[in-house]
Amino acid sequence: LPDQVPTGGDGVWAHFFGQEAYSMTLAARLAQMNGVATLFFVGERLPHGRGFALHVYPLEGEIGRDKLANVETINRNVEKLIRLFPSQYLFSYNRFKTPAGAEPKPSSGLKD
């Protein structure tokens, strides 16, 4: 779940829907492994209790050596999937908070 808020010290500040969000680095680190395909899975709840449809998407973009660039690549992919299935995305936590122990948000805005 790359859109979860990591504990302080376990993430980086990166773009997420045009705002600075403390983002986990685990998905980006896993994507750096040689020979490993990075896939995103979306479970779409079908109407009228008909079950679920599973959608699988490959990573779009490159994963390199730069941790922040890699996390932002993951975040862009998550944003794309949320835009494809906006009614399916729900979270009940403050995605843009500063967790205890995290570096403060950068003072320069990251707005696109």
Indicate where each model-derived feature is located.
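Non-catalytic C-terminal accessory region of glycerolipid acyltransferases
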Residues: 1-112
